[in-house]
């Protein structure tokens, strides 16, 4: 299975409009050109048309929007003002935006925010940023304007991991999903349950796999005990129960050590009767320490991408 090829085919079939927020970055401009040329999606590229032209790529079919001259800027400023109305700036103790004009001034300085506003207004289906902006600056507009899906309180991330040879001893289609490896440092049981449900949805909709979700720990079904005063295993057990209640249709179980989650012979030994043990393809790490280390080990030592 060629995951990227399959993903491109899905994108072509969907025919969505995507905002690329960083028209000042040569890589983003080239990507916009390729995406439109191959019919992967419709593209709105934010930036100055003259500056974008200097990169020398064919921009035929790419809609270039300069926020500073965009006729829709007032509409998007209104969207931002309403989304943040009543929010107080913690540093000044004053409202974030005194009026729509202040919201507009802020949006025109932050093209990632502008892209989020285009999406929020219904003029696009998604926005992409982060090529030349920090994680914090990339996430902030989404957190402030787009917010979370109904029923989900926790914003989280996940990594779709693809085997180097396209398949793996334990995962014949070569695809797994790891969450959350980048955002939530020490999630609570409730947050971990949200992460599990959201990651499973990504596994199904984007990775194209039927998720079998393993809630990871150093313990498998009570094999390990917490040190006094800690609740590391207990948190995962609670999160597992909460996730099952939130999404009873999911194949989800835990707590599992990684080998019990992925290796059939270990899963059968340590968690007999579990539909997930030994067959998991979607892995929920208990905190960002474990998740970040885990995906980088898979990438650097295992060659997963």
Give the location of each predicted region.
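Anion-binding alpha/beta catalytic cores of soluble intermediary-metabolism enzymes, centered on
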Residues: 1-277, 281-305
């Amino acid at each position: 299975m060629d995951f990227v090829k399959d993903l491109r085919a899905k994108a072509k079939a969907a025919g969505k409009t995507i905002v690329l927020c960083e028209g000042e970055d040569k890589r983003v401009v080239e990507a916009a050109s390729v995406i439109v040329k191959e019919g992967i999606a419709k593209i709105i590229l934010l930036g100055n048309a003259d500056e974008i032209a200097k990169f020398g790529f064919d921009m035929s079919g790419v809609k270039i929007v300069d926020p500073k001259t965009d006729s829709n800027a007032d509409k998007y400023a209104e969207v931002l003002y309403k989304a943040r109305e009543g929010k107080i700036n913690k540093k000044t103790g004053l409202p974030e935006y005194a009026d729509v004009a202040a919201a507009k001034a802020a949006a025109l300085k932050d093209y990632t925010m502008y892209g989020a506003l285009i999406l929020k207004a219904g003029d696009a289906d998604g926005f992409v940023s982060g090529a030349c902006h920090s994680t914090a600056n990339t996430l902030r507009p989404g957190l402030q304007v787009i917010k979370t899906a109904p029923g989900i309180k926790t914003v989280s991330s996940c990594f779709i991991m693809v085997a180097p040879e396209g398949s793996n001893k334990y995962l014949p289609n070569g695809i797994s999903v790891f969450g959350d490896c980048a955002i939530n440092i020490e999630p609570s049981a409730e947050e971990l349950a949200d992460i599990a449900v959201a990651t499973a949805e990504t596994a199904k909709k984007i990775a194209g796999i039927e998720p079998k979700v393993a809630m990871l720990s150093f313990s498998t079904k009570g094999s390990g005990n917490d040190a006094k005063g800690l609740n590391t295993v207990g948190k995962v057990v609670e999160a597992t129960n909460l996730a099952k209640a939130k999404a009873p249709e999911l194949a989800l179980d835990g707590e599992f050590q990684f080998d019990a989650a992925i290796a059939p012979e270990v899963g059968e030994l340590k968690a007999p009767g579990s539909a997930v043990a030994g067959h998991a393809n979607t892995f929920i790490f208990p905190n960002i320490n474990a998740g970040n280390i885990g995906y980088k080990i898979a990438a650097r030592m295992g060659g997963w991408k």
